[in-house]
């Protein structure tokens, strides 16, 4: 169903492209051939990054991607990362954050994005814990994931793409490095 491809930097659509600001559609099943091709690209791109092969393919390394970043306006995300809790690998259709903590966090080095050429300085403030529901495209079953730390930030980042938002939209414009004492640094 999904094919391993050689990832290309030409696949990535940037934030200044009007496609990135159009409404994103829910995925309807069964998947189309186009859906399967885009998912193959998503898996190939992020897995090459995960396996340390970004330089080999001259791509910018990433831990997550949304279908819209490849020009496909459908709610599909793929995350593949390691953190203190181990390896995480999620390919989801129609992901939705259904619950979130009141506590907040930020990544101490800030965030980046495959679709943003010029990095924006500052801290993207995120919820510390999120519960995400969607269709697991590896099993074709609905799942609910409780995510914390880097995984929570990544889910929020990718779901933001489905709402035409970027990490820099979460940076305080007047004080980009503003934090409160009770916010957790990741």
Swiss-Prot record:
Its cofactor is Fe(2+). The active site is at residue 158. Transmembrane segments: none annotated. It catalyses: N-terminal N-formyl-L-methionyl-[peptide] + H2O = N-terminal L-methionyl-[peptide] + formate. One of its GO terms (biological process) is co-translational protein modification. SUPFAM superfamilies: Peptide deformylase. Binds 1 Fe(2+) ion. It is an enzyme of class 3 (hydrolase). Its EC number is 3.5.1.88. GO terms for molecular function: metal ion binding; peptide deformylase activity. Keywords: Hydrolase, Iron, Metal-binding, Protein biosynthesis. Fe cation binds at residues 113, 157, 161. Pfam families: Pep_deformylase (PF01327). Belongs to the polypeptide deformylase family. Removes the formyl group from the N-terminal Met of newly synthesized proteins. Requires at least a dipeptide for an efficient rate of reaction. N-terminal L-methionine is a prerequisite for activity but the enzyme has broad specificity at other positions. PANTHER family: PEPTIDE DEFORMYLASE. HAMAP family: Pep_deformylase. This is Peptide deformylase. The lineage of its organism: Bacteria, Bacillati, Mycoplasmatota, Mycoplasmoidales, Mycoplasmoidaceae.
């Amino acid at each position: 169903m999904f094919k391993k491809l050689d990832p290309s930097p030409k696949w990535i659509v940037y934030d200044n492209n009007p496609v990135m600001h159009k409404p994103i559609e829910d995925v309807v099943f069964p998947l189309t051939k186009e859906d399967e091709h885009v998912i193959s690209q998503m898996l190939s791109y992020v897995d090459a990054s995960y396996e340390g092969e970004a330089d080999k393919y001259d791509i910018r390394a990433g831990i997550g991607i949304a279908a819209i970043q490849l020009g496909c306006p459908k709610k599909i995300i793929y995350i593949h990362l390691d953190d203190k809790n181990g390896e995480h690998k999620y390919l989801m259709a129609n992901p939705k954050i259904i619950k979130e903590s009141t506590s907040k966090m930020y990544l101490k080095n800030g965030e980046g994005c495959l679709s943003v050429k010029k990095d924006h300085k500052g801290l993207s403030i995120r919820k510390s814990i999120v519960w995400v529901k969607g269709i697991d495209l590896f099993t074709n079953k609905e799942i609910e994931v409780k995510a914390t730390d880097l995984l929570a930030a990544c889910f929020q980042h990718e779901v933001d793409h489905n709402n035409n938002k970027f990490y820099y939209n979460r940076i305080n414009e007047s004080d980009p490095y503003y934090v409160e004492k009770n916010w957790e640094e990741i």
